[in-house]
Amino acid sequence: MSDPLYIFNRSQSEIVVESLLASSNLRSSMPTQQIQSLRVFVATWNVGGKSPHSGLNLDALLHVHSEFDVYVLGFQEIVPLNAGNVLVLGDNEPAAKWLAMINQSLNKSSSSSGGRLSPKTPSFGAGSMFFAKPSLKKISESFRTECRRKLKICNCSTFSEDIVRKYGRESCFRCPEGLVNQSGVLSDDEEDEDDDDDDEDEDEGGGKVASLVSNQMTMKYGLVASKQMVGIFLTVWMRKELIQHVSHLRISSVTRGIMGCLGNKGCIAVSLQLYKTSFCFICSHLASGEREGDERRRNLDVIEILKNTSFPRICRTSFTRVPDRITKHDRVIWLGDLNYRIALSYSETKTLLDKNAWDTLLNKDQLKIERDAGRVFKGWHEGKIFFAPTYKYSYNSDAYAGDTSKEKKNKRRTPAWCDRILWHGDGIRQLSYVRGESRFSDHRPVCSVFVVDVEVCEGKTGTRRQ
């Protein structure tokens, strides 16, 4: 008679073997990982509290003919930093205008669009939305309507039995109630937390806003995220076909203004996952001042931003790594008016500027000094600077403030590279680091182009960019 224990062990072994074979077959049919390269355009611009006017054209700033995969655009001082905007209700009309102008540049009709017309954008003439007080919420929704339908909160896969049975179908779980619908995508009634004050009845500009996107299917770029905190404004755009591969989109902000708690200084951070790679984009405006020791206040701002920026977990799968801190992301780009100055007097700086003595000036750059000493941005990277200091210019002029006899001495500021772009993590290669020459503000915009490696699943749709 057979040994019952032997029969039991034999049965268990068969089960184990069958399970291993099934697991092996599953792994062999799973998509393999591959690396694709995407081109990311990043720009930062302190616009000096000025709202965009009808004559401002962003085409040159955004290098629209180069057709990047991702645009990360950060602004500072989009509103005047007065008590009304800082202490009371913020003004989001300028942010709405900036969004409209960005969309106008990115989605205008071009020969590369195959002859299709891009969505209508505001004509900044009489009767346009520039005179109808545009709503940031309405414009954001217009630019996100089609893209939001595709934007998944969570697209993580799991090896649980129900997923094994359904393998081959796209995995996308429901996340926190109220954020997503049954299909796991952003619901159309989601409210932007910074737009709660925009629920007023539709004004005469409503029709203009509605007409901004007459045919969403023809949009080349879609708005992925935008957030305003007083004068800081961060917006992220992507090629439309990429947006369906975005998940875990989260936004965080840290205030570092007066007494460390007002939003006139601080940062906005956007976290997202593109395919299988996590990204974090930070737009900041740090403490101002060119007195000795002010650089330590800026260092503290950076330290507190890194410490206090956190992102909520919105992934249903418990084993999935969803980064909750800035430096835990695979690819991180930090942009903004960092406000670091040159540790020289005005006259010494001007003398070196006149001689184009960039290396000597850069050796006195506070950010370089603080980084080299390991006091701030340890482990971060910045490209070589080959452009003139970006601050402070006289308005509508190529002269630095204080250069002309008409300007009072108290308006003089030592020229400095206040506006910077840094990055953290592997798989990021900088192709260019330049400044723009718009005279719109007392700052010059700064732009950078990166080639970023993204881990994708073979078989997923996406375009390789070199």
UniProtKB/Swiss-Prot annotation:
Region of interest (Disordered), ranges: 183-209
UniProt keyword annotation of Hydrolase present: yes
Gene3D superfamilies (alphabetical): Endonuclease/exonuclease/phosphatase
GO biological process: phosphatidylinositol dephosphorylation
Region feature (Catalytic 2): 411-426
Xref: Pfam families: Exo_endo_phos2 (PF22669)
InterPro entries, per the entry: Endo/exonu/phosph_ase_sf, IP5P_plant, IPPc
SUPFAM superfamilies assigned: DNase I-like (SSF56219)
Annotated segments matching region Catalytic 1: 330-345
Alphabetic keyword roster: Hydrolase
Family: Belongs to the inositol polyphosphate 5-phosphatase family.
Protein name, UniProt field: Type I inositol polyphosphate 5-phosphatase 10
EC number in record: 3.1.3.-
Tree of life domain: Eukaryota
Record has Hydrolase as a keyword: yes
Biased composition (Acidic residues): 187-204
Organism, scientific name: Arabidopsis thaliana (Mouse-ear cress)
GO molecular function, one term: inositol-polyphosphate 5-phosphatase activity
